[in-house]
Amino acid sequence: MSPARGDANASVARASGGSSNGAVTADEVVVQVDDSDENRENLRDRDRADKLEKLEKDAHARSQTQTQVQAPPVTVSSFRSANGDAIRAYRSETALTMKPRPRGSTSSTPTTTIPPLRPGRPSSPESPSLKRLSPRYSPTILASRTSRFSNRTGIRDSQSPSPILADEMVGRESLRKRPATSNTPAPKTPTPKNTEWTVDKIASALSVLAEEVPQNHSRLVNFLLEETEKRAPQPRHLSKTDPFAHMKSKAIDANRPRPEGVPTMDVKFKQHSGEYGKSRNSGRRFQYPVVCIKPDREPVPPYRFHHAEIRKNILALNSQLNFVPHLRDVDPNSAEEQKYSAWLMDLENLDSKSGFKIQPRSQKIAKRAQAEYAATLAPYLEPWLRKLNIEGCTKSNLIRFMASQPESDDSMTPQQKSNLLDTYSDDMGSPQAVRNASMFTEAWDRVFNDQSKLRRVALRDILMLDKNVEPIFDNKRAKDAPGSQKPPDEALMQKVIDALGSYTTLGCLICFSHDCEHGEIERDNQKRCFSLEEIGGLMPSLRRKWAAQIEQRQKTEGGSANAPPAHPPCRNECYRIHGTGDPNQQVPPWSENEVGTLEWMFATIGYSQTLRPECFVGAILGRPCWDVHRKLQELDLRLPPVEPRTIPKQKSLPWYDRRKKQLMSDWADATITHEHAVRELFAPCHHDGPCTAANGCPCASAGTHPVLCERFCLCTAEECPLKFTGCACHSSGKTCLQRQREGRPCICVQLNRECDPTLCKGCGARERADPENAYDEVLHSTGCQNVALQRGAAKAVVLGKSQLEACGYGLFAAEDIEEGEFVIEYTGELISHDEGVRREHRRGDVFDEENKVSYLFTLLEQEGIWVDAAIYGNLSRYINHATDGNIMPKIMYVNHEWRIKFTAIKDIKAGEELFFNYGDNFPNLTKKLVERNEQSGAETTPQQPKRANGAATQRATARKTTSKAKGEGIGFDDDDRDGNDSDPDDLWMGDQQQQQQQQQQQQQQQQQQQQQQQQQQQQQQQQQAQKPQPSTSHQPQSRAERSSTETGSEEISPDKQLRRENHDAQRQLLHQFQQQEQQQQQQQQQQQQQQTLPRKEPKKEELEEEIDLDAPRRSRLKRRLEALKGDSSSGGSANEQPPVKKPSRRGGARPGAGRKPKHRPPGAKGKDSKGKKGPSSSAGATTGAGSGESSGVNETGEEEVAVNGKSDSKDEAKEEETDKEKEEDEKVNEKDREKGRDSLSSPTEEPIAFLPVTKSAPSPAKKQASSPTKISDSNRTTSKNTSSNNNNNTNNNNNNNNNEFPSPVISPRKTRSSDHLTNSQPAALSPSATTRKRKASDLTSDTHLSAAGKGSDPSTMTTTTTTTTTTTSSSSSSSSSSSSSSSSSKAQPILEEKGDDDDENNEPITSPLKRQKTSSSLSSSHSMSVFSEAKEGVNGAVPGSGRNLRSSGVKVDSSGLNSTSLSQERGEKHEKHEKEKPKEKKGEKERERERDRSEEADEELLPMDRSMRKRQKPARYRDEGE
């Protein structure tokens, strides 16, 4: 056969298997090529019109007679297999052979056998899809469907043409190449005949074309299956026999009884069918015998969510419930199914409240099927339009027609409609095209949008999937319609804005990418990028840039803005050398895109001195520089005029200096920049003028407190006082820390942000924030230490089973971590709070609500932004909860994004589990769950031990809550470390020593509780459980032990005698449970009187009279006594333990109450106790009964004073009042007024602050002795020597369970009490401090001193300040023996004193350490001075100086047993003081003489009156100490 010429008779037939009706049953195609002379002759006659007309009629007649043939062969006019050309088929009805070739037949013509064109094509009759398109249609080649398991020789190779393409080519040729009429020769490319299309014809044609969709889908699936089978791996079985092939089912008939002793399992098989895949109820149940296996290994903890590891947070849109969560199979019409359905309704209601359109599940399934069907039909639209060849009916015209319909107005905005019409304005058709588009749309909806079909889709749904239509409905920037003629500069800027619109909208200002995770989700559930649109768009940024360039050029050159550039000419034939070049030189013409690039680059470069647009654009486009310069002159491009900037001078803020880069005092109260959780998010400011609230600056008017302007704001440091300019740290040594060796702390650290590599230039943050230097330890050993998150070098951590029972997994440290080091970042999806609530509810198990797992973390509470680490996150999601954790989360501001950083708060060894206190870090749902389980756990959980060595308490659990809660917090069982079931070989839980210590500790605590219950029969258990102490701490002694220790002592110290006398005077006011110990005090009192001088014993009536005097200044005290009596009487029934007197903010049962604060102006009136300010506020009168006696520091830093017993009534005290004492009181007041002693203390004095420490130096008792300490009347004490024992004995006497806090310690520096927020710390008061501060508080208090018995150090003493109506007898009478032993194990309480330089006379500060040296010159023991001062406090003498020794008349030697006249001691001190008089200052002499004059009236003054005088410490004590 000649491949170049001739129209050979080629017939395509199938090798039949002997079918009578000519059906095709063969698996191969046979092509017969007829190259005979007769055929050639027929080709010559083809051009004759009469011959063709006759042949056409004959062919038409034959086609009607052979309609029964299923697969007729097709004649191929030419077949070129040698060169691989495509098949070309010419319709020749004369050569058409309709007979199938029988099996085994022969022919004289050569026959060529080829494989089928398309494997797997089903055997079917001629496709009517193409036959109905034209009456002159000829059948195309139809290949038979090969079996998937047939011979591989019939599979098409990759080089063979696609059968779909071949069909389409044959169809096109058949439609296009029609025979010419008999009078005219046939043209080479005949013009198709125009068809008058109607809606019915189009619908019929679309119905035929629709049949291709399932056929092509089946071909595609078959092809994919066969290709997969070819690439399937070979089986690698060890044996060719299948051991399970002959295995029979061991199912037991459910109707038969179960065999005894054989465990079985019920299995139900369900078949899902019907609409939407619902299961049938006719499932059969089978029973299978099973063998229960218990492995020797511990099972791996289960978890529900497998996370995808991410390094940074990612944005997540609000998502609707797309599928129904499957928890487990439930029986139909059961209670579980109803509960499950109700839960699904709750999920849908949450979506509805969030703004989503809720549809029934059936509609959702139908809509999903509709979307899938639309995606399937979308690729067929354009090919079908080309086949139908309808005039003007193109896809563009269909989109324009869709946009112009009235029903489209409801689904699109006018702007979107305008954008659609403008986008497809280039292909505007004729009116006939519009009519055809309307007919095609109607026909499409008739065929594919039938309401009776499950899968239906409208033409609009197909067109909306177009790649040009979808972005228009995605909030794309609208293009301005062409308007009137604009000036050249405005027209240029409009072109630049249009050209750079995508960069302006999508370009991120942080990472400079166009698809990143920076930005936020708007309310319409659309992402808003952090781009130039956030700061006003492109034009404001360009204008500011031009203005800055002009100012810089004027400063450097002093010329105009059009001055020549300073940089040298470029090497690309620069225009500065060649000008506009040779005009005769041929250059390529400029395209439209090149001109646009030149325009927007010209505007972007602006007035730069270092870069010219000619040189830059020439390098980009590959053109000579002079060519670009010539084009610029042709275009005559000019920038719009720029107004010069006027920078007004702005003063620095009082709390922030942008030039010094530091924060001033009280900055935390002036701004909320550092409080990320409560601040609001504002777009960077881009206004004109200064950044002030009056000018509308969002940064300056951010609520009541401004925030600093960030580097993305368009303001500058010259004009904005709020502009953040980075830190001023240097790069030598380790810098950017909270506490630095030199200079102020880093401002970035203070503001809870990491150093900005752009702004912080001195500390080296740029090099250390580079990820390439993340593991360069040498570089990070110096310089900035505040770029941990930007560095991204987390500590090595591993995942393992948590130490908390039923908690699943936990995170463990794989290396040693020092305190303050960065551990890991908490990453996840950034979601809104509404989305977080829905996700939390979806993940819950409706059948097991207690087992909920939460991975939500509150990032910005004010803005409602959470971090969800359930699906996307890192290993930090496994960190569990503990009250005392070893790491702490912190929200940091890092380059305009907020991130969560975990830092170690203590040293962590490798292998320790990481914990942190969830607290308020987790959102509402988790928080409520935690609180609920805490309440349930507190009610049902016994006391849990605390881990030894100060480790974190494991009673709190992780975020993974469970119904097995038995502990506090969220509630789980005790840690295995606290039990007896821990494995000693376990790496994480083998700690036998700690377990033994905890067991011993539990036994000791139980014994102590039993002893306390026996001694305190009327006392019930306290409301709060006793908190455990480490095994190394000292356990308080019980009352029985202290009583036995004191009664067994052979000798009584003088200071104990004073306490007995004081208790005897108040014996009738004590609680009932203290009466037994009062009898022991009376016996010891007789022995004490033999060793001490006789003294007047205060009577009960006198003490009551001091409380209930009718003077106006005691009115506040009366109200407090009444409140105290009411509280004690009401709370006594429930808990008979004496109430604890709780101090108010400015008053209460504490020394120095009622004094003016420092910030209070003189003459300012205090407020009464009815909820107002004042020294006797009833708010701090008492605490709840049963809370235990305690002594410490309240929330304002002032001392809490322990109060025992009950107060007597006001009337009873008045009845016992005597006239003689009234007269004495009036005389004393008269003397005070004469001597000017009624003045209050200086309002500049401040109360005492306590500093907690962990341990104290075990110094000997004699070294601790010091001179009597001076007590200021402004709520300060300076007792150092007795503070440790005071604290121990106060706790032992008042609250045996209150040993959880460390003892307060003296700090020699000045400290405000408000600087320390230590709550409920024991207060240690010296005798002089107790008496003096008691007088200042309108509450007549007595001083109880506790001294050691025989064998005890007399320097270890305790004072407990209590009111007369609520004092303790025996509880504070026998604590010296325990205090001496506890002083070595517990911290020495040392009180902090504010120096006298803050007082009126500005005396220098006296260190408590210096006062210790004074004891050697005053007395030989510390107990002497304390005893003398305490005695003076009870009898009326003013303590605080050496004159108390003279008035008391008692001297005690170093052993505390021998006594002499105190007047002699006073005389010795006076003589020594006279020798040192030249050293004293004038002010000190005057104050000393005033104190000497006041000593005569000290015995007569009431404690309340004495408290109103200011007492200064004699200077001689300081001189002697120095």
UniProtKB/Swiss-Prot annotation:
Region: SANT1L domain, residue numbers: 361-480
Region (SRM domain): 321-360
Region annotated MCSS domain, chain positions: 481-560
Effect after changing residue 839 to D: Impairs allosteric activation by H3K27me3
UniProt: Zn(2+) 1 binding residues: 508, 511, 516, 518
Signal peptide span: none
Residues the record lists as binding Zn(2+) 5: 691, 709, 715, 720
Predominant subcellular localization, coarse grouping: nucleus
Catalytic activity, EC: 2.1.1.356
MF GO annotations: chromatin binding; histone H3K27 methyltransferase activity; metal ion binding
Chain positions recorded as S-adenosyl-L-homocysteine binding sites: 809, 852, 854-855, 881, 927
Residue span, SET domain: 795-919
Activity modulation comment: The end product of PRC2 catalysis, H3K27me3, interacts with EED to stimulate the enzymatic activity of PRC2 allosterically. The enzymatic activity of PRC2 is regulated in a very complex manner and PCR2 can adopt different stages including the autoinhibited (A); SAM-bound autoinhibited (A'), basal (B), and H3K27me3-stimulated (S) stages. Actictivity is inhibited by pyridone inhibitors such as GSK126.
GO BP terms, alphabetized: heterochromatin formation; methylation
Protein's UniProt keywords contain Transcription: yes
SMART domains, alphabetized: SET (SM00317)
Residues covered by region (SANT2L domain): 561-650
Annotated binding of Zn(2+) 6, by residue: 727, 729, 736, 746
Biased composition (Low complexity): 64-76, 103-130, 180-195, 992-1024, 1072-1091, 1255-1299, 1355-1385, 1415-1428
Region (Disordered): 1-196, 406-426, 933-1522
Chain intervals for the UniProt region annotation (SAL domain): 301-320
Family per record: Belongs to the class V-like SAM-binding methyltransferase superfamily. Histone-lysine methyltransferase family. EZ subfamily.
Domain remarks: Ten structurally and functionally discrete domains are dispersed across the entire active complex and compose an extended structural scaffold to accommodate juxtaposed EED and SUZ12. The N terminus forms an intramolecular interaction with the SANT1-like (SANT1L) domain and is referred to as the SANT1L-binding domain (SBD). The EED-binding domain (EBD) is found next to the SBD in the current structure, where the EBD similarly occupies a surface groove across the bottom face of the EED WD40 domain.
Function recorded in the entry: Catalytic subunit of the of the Polycomb Repressive Complex 2 (PRC2), a histone H3 lysine methyltransferase responsible for generating mono-, di-, and tri-methylation on Lys27 (H3K27me1, H3K27me2 and H3K27me3). The tri-methylated form is known to be critical in gene repression, and its proper placement is essential in defining repression patterns during development. The PRC2 complex interacts with thousands of RNA species in vivo, but the physiological function of RNA binding has still to be determined.
Quaternary structure note: Component of the polycomb repressive complex 2 (PRC2) that consists of four core subunits icluding EZH2, EED, SUZ12, and RBBP4, among which EZH2 is the catalytic subunit and which minimally requires EED and SUZ12 for catalysis.
Protein name: Histone-lysine N-methyltransferase EZH2
